[in-house]
UniProtKB/Swiss-Prot annotation:
Primary residence: membrane
Organism: Mus musculus
GO aspect biological process, one term: adhesion of symbiont to host
Protein's name according to its UniProt entry: Scavenger receptor class B member 1
Function: Receptor for different ligands such as phospholipids, cholesterol ester, lipoproteins, phosphatidylserine and apoptotic cells. Both isoform 1 and isoform 2 act as receptors for HDL, mediating selective uptake of cholesteryl ether and HDL-dependent cholesterol efflux. Also facilitates the flux of free and esterified cholesterol between the cell surface and apoB-containing lipoproteins and modified lipoproteins, although less efficiently than HDL. May be involved in the phagocytosis of apoptotic cells, via its phosphatidylserine binding activity.
Keyword RNA-binding (UniProt): no
Topology feature Cytoplasmic, residues: 1-11, 462-509
Lipid attachment, kind S-palmitoyl cysteine: C462
InterPro entries assigned: CD36/SCARB1/SNMP1, CD36_fam
Membrane association type: Multi-pass membrane protein
Record's note on what induces expression: Both isoform 1 and isoform 2 are up-regulated in response to adrenocorticotropic hormone (ACTH).
């Protein structure tokens, strides 16, 4: 009896423990999603106490700017009206460092800051050096000629004579460093003297002269501390709640974030919106597919076909016009009238007429499309590759001899890629705190529930087995009594007189 009693108490103890585990599992199922959400919101908001604040303040991920040039192989033939032939040169790679300074938290749940940016050439990652010479269109001559097209003949003649005097030609042969970071040009001085509002610069002229050791202006964004629904959204840029470069209210809107973090808890229906001062507009990327980056689940967002579509293909983009072929965006209104166009590299996803007008272009999605891989729970980018091309519209301008017989064409100048992928300690910390721990909690709730269910079966099984033993005992006892009664009855029948006589008769026979 003692052993049976102990077994019964053990079974009851295991059952109680199972009930406790099951209750904990149910509580976790009800509470864990809310706890995870609170933990994520606590760590992605712009607040000095949040886990992501240091990452937001100074990007710890190695970020690179890779530049590819379209060298013009046949400049003399282009001047005589032939189709341009280009050859891609590069990449020329720069390590990009970004740090937010002048961080000021405001009373309306926003924070203002300036993000300083510096670029450092990486010879080991580049195919060439900054001293490489490259033949490109002379933007000052050909771009300036377009701007002078509607000017009086006298001004055109003055410009032609000035170009001859200064030895300026339609195409130039300069180093990578000069093209990107600037060079002294007497023509810049001439334009600033006689057409003072034509150029935004007073010193050196270069395509990226304002990108190094500089910033993109003052951003004011929502922190998400008081109102989670607006987290990371841009409130103002340089004090403006909208821009005035374009011809419609929609195109002038400042939408989305500053392009570094987005709101958490994304779904495949979510989109990535951000404002780019360099592109002078807001952009929207759409969900493409689910992926895994270094063990972390991500959503890949890519550019829709409508991003650079013209107004006839996509009416909401009409405000960015005057437009040319679909797939390129005229950015002259925010580049002081210079006939510059923004697009995907090699005119990928643009009207084929554009790539067919220039020999040497080979657009393909693998090499020339852009993407951002975002962790959907936190809205933090894990891997990104943003690619853009800058092109110049050139043609012969009557009255300016340097433009020769150039046929109208949108000629690519260069394309660049800004890329970065989270790794090292930041990736490890991110994975542990915001991926691994939520996963452990998620699975723990079901483990507890399952284990609790199994332990609850122990006393039930023991009870059933105990009842079975009792049944067998009583069944056995009843059967034994019946057998004894049968034997006794048989014995008594043998001892009766009638039975004895029968037995004697059988013996005599």
């Amino acid at each position: 009896m003692g052993g049976s009693s102990r077994a019964r108490w053990v079974a009851l103890g295991l059952g109680a423990l199972g009930l406790l585990f099951a209750a904990l599992g149910v509580v976790m199922i009800l509470m864990v999603p809310s706890l995870i959400k609170q933990q994520v919101l606590k760590n992605v908001r712009i607040d000095p106490s949040s886990l992501s604040f240091g990452m937001w303040k100074e990007i710890p991920v190695p970020f690179y700017l890779s530049v590819y040039f379209f060298e013009v192989v046949n400049p003399n033939e282009v001047l005589n009206g032939q189709k341009p032939v280009v050859r891609e040169r590069g990449p020329y790679v720069y390590r990009e460092f970004r740090q937010k300074v002048n961080i000021t938290f405001n009373d309306n749940d926003t924070v203002s800051f300036v993000e300083n940016r510096s670029l450092h050439f990486q010879p080991d990652k580049s195919h060439g050096s900054e001293s490489d010479y490259i033949v490109l269109p002379n933007i000052l001559v050909l771009g300036g000629s377009i701007l002078m097209e509607s000017k009086p003949v006298s001004l055109k003649l003055m410009m032609t004579l000035a170009l001859v005097t200064m030895g300026q030609r339609a195409f130039m042969n300069r180093t990578v460093g000069e093209i990107l970071w600037g060079y002294d040009d007497p023509f810049v001085h001439f334009l600033n003297t006689y057409l003072p509002d034509m150029l935004p610069i007073k010193g050196k002229f270069g395509l990226f002269v304002g990108m190094n050791n500089s910033n993109s202006g003052v951003f004011t964004v929502f922190t998400g501390v008081q109102n989670f629904s607006r987290i990371h959204l841009v409130d103002k840029w340089n004090g403006l709640s909208k821009i005035d470069y374009w011809h419609s209210e929609q195109c002038n809107m400042i939408n989305g974030t500053s392009g570094q973090m987005w709101a958490p808890f994304m779904t495949p229906e979510s989109s990535l919106e951000f404002f780019s001062p360099e592109a002078c507009r807001s952009m929207k990327l759409t969900y493409n597919e689910s992926r895994v980056f270094e063990g972390i689940p991500t959503y890949r967002f890519t550019a829709p076909d409508t991003l650079f579509a013209n107004g006839s293909v996509y009416p909401p983009n009409e405000g960015f016009c005057p437009c040319r072929e679909s797939g390129i965006q005229n950015v002259s209104t925010c580049r002081f009238g210079a006939p510059l166009f923004l697009s995907h590299p090699h005119f990928y996803n643009a009207d084929p007429v554009l790539s067919e007008a220039v020999l040497g272009l080979n657009p393909n999605p693998k090499e020339h499309s852009l993407f951002l891989d975002i962790h959907p729970v936190t809205g933090i980018p894990m891997n990104c590759s943003v690619k853009m091309q800058l092109s110049l519209y050139i043609k012969s301008v009557k009255g300016i001899g340097q433009t020769g017989k150039i046929e109208p064409v949108v000629l690519p100048l260069l394309w660049f890629e800004q890329s970065g992928a989270m790794g090292g300690k930041p990736l490890s910390t991110f994975y542990t705190q915001l991926v691994l721990m939520p996963q452990v909690l998620h699975y723990a709730q079901y483990v507890l529930l399952g284990l609790g269910g199994l332990l609850l079966l122990v006393p039930i099984i023991c009870q059933l087995r105990s009842q079975e033993k009792c049944f067998l005992f009583w069944s056995g006892s009843k059967k034994g009594s019946q057998d004894k009664e049968a034997i006794q009855a048989y014995s008594e029948s043998l001892m009766s007189p009638a039975a004895k006589g029968t037995v004697l008769q059988e013996a005599k026979l």
